[in-house]
A protein has these predicted regions:
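N-terminal Rossmann-like FAD-binding beta1-loop-alpha1 element of flavoenzymes
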Residues: 6-33, 376
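Glycine-rich FAD pyrophosphate-binding loop
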Residues: 25-50
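Short hydrophobic core segments
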Residues: 9-11, 34, 233-245
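Short, well-ordered alpha-helix to beta-strand connector turns
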Residues: 6, 28, 216, 234-236, ...
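Short catalytic/ligand-binding loop motif for oxyanion handling, primarily in non-cytosolic enzymes
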Residues: 41-43, 88-90, 96-97, 155, ...
Length: 376
């Protein structure tokens, strides 16, 4: 066996690829990780601007209730105490997210769980009555579904505009199943996640990726598809984390995605919005949210030690060739198309498909690591 032969060629250095390489390397396997971008880390890559780790491909917050996963990532890099507590801005008024007693006080002035529940029940009943008046018993679209779950006020101010910007379609044109449930908390708790553990790697996500890939051979600026037969010939098995339809030369057609555009700017003040995440929930503001990156890793007085800050405005758009694919569009048509590719993938003996693009599935970070751990 020559020196240039590998047990695994791993296409893509995002969380799936990097975790796979780490665990395979620990078992003594010889791995090569290639990535078409100029950097490692996939979409969790951070760019350092003005001493601030900027989440180049959108905000990533690690959260899990799986102790095994939490212990694993903390064995690579220590995680900080960041807690995701977004704020919604609707026409200049601020509301806490997720929907909790703070939100209901801000919306209606109610101060007890009973008052809040009564107000929600009253608004839900009104929504059901409106549907009945139209001769409808089941919600026909997202708008009706959201209103029977949470009522008109919260829907109009905090859900409608944001959702329409995210999907590029009116809520009356979106299917009801997109919102299966809307968690309502009758407690004063702004922690977005219910998980036991959450945080951001101390020093940023690049520290996690570099730690996972320590001792593993990597090559950047390498496109697997430009020299496919060569890459396929240098390893016993391939771990593929790119787009599954591209792997099969789009033979059944192209899968659809939503993408996100980021306008990132340096601001000459230490604190722009006082929070990492502020959602803009009215339709008239073109962006969906503003991320202020320093709040992921700097707390209290630390915020003021750096006189500058970096913000990213997020714009959600329809994906076109050449754009970064972010979110799969799991409608009927795309799901059926993916099923055809999945059928081919299942027959592969020497290719492992994993991650958001290869499985055409939205993933949080922790489940990706969990999935790779199950393989080993």
């Amino acid at each position: 066996m020559n020196d240039n032969h590998y047990d695994y060629l791993i296409v893509g250095s995002g969380l799936f690829g990097a975790t796979f390489a780490h665990l395979a390397h620990k078992q003594g396997k010889k791995c090569l990780v290639i990535d078409k971008r100029a950097h490692l880390g996939g979409n969790i890559f951070c760019e350092n601007i003005e001493g601030i780790n900027v989440h180049k491909y959108g905000a990533h917050i690690f959260h899990t209730s799986n102790k095994k996963v939490w212990d694993f990532v903390n064995s690579i890099v220590e995680f900080n105490r960041y807690t995701n507590s977004p704020v919604a801005n609707y026409k200049g008024k601020l509301y806490n997210l997720p929907f909790n007693m703070n939100t209901f006080y801000q919306m209606w002035g109610v101060t007890t769980p009973e008052e809040a529940q009564a107000k929600i029940d009253e608004q839900k009943a009104e929504a059901v009555a409106r549907m009945k008046a139209d001769g409808v018993t089941e919600p026909r679209n997202l708008e009706e579904q959201a209103q029977i779950l949470i009522g008109k006020d919260i829907y109009e101010k905090l859900i409608k505009g944001y959702t329409e910007k995210q999907w590029g379609r009116k809520c009356t044109e979106l299917p009801a199943f997109i919102i299966k449930r809307l968690p309502v908390r009758l407690i004063f708790d702004n922690n977005y996640f219910n998980d036991k553990y959450q945080g951001i790697p101390v020093g940023g996500y690049n520290k996690l990726i570099d730690g996972l890939l320590e001792g593993v051979e990597t090559k950047t600026n390498v496109d697997f598809f430009e020299n496919r037969s060569y890459w396929e010939g240098i390893a016993d098995k391939i771990v593929f984390t790119g787009k599954i339809d591209e792997f099969y030369n789009y033979q059944f057609g192209k899968l659809n995605y939503r993408t996100v555009r980021f306008d990132t700017e340096v601001i000459d003040k230490p604190n722009y919005q006082g929070n990492a995440v502020v959602n803009y929930t009215e339709r008239e503001v073109p962006y969906t949210r503003v991320i202020e990156h320093k709040h992921f890793e700097m707390f209290g007085q630390e915020v003021y030690e750096n006189p500058k800050t970096v913000i990213s405005k997020e714009f959600s758009t329809e994906w076109k060739d050449g754009m970064e694919p972010y979110y799969p569009v799991n409608d009927k048509q795309n799901s059926e198309l993916y099923a055809k590719y999945k059928e081919l993938a299942d027959k592969e003996e020497n290719v492992i498909f994993g991650g958001r693009l290869a499985e055409y599935k939205y993933y949080d970070m922790a489940p990706i690591i969990e999935k790779v751990m199950e393989i080993f």
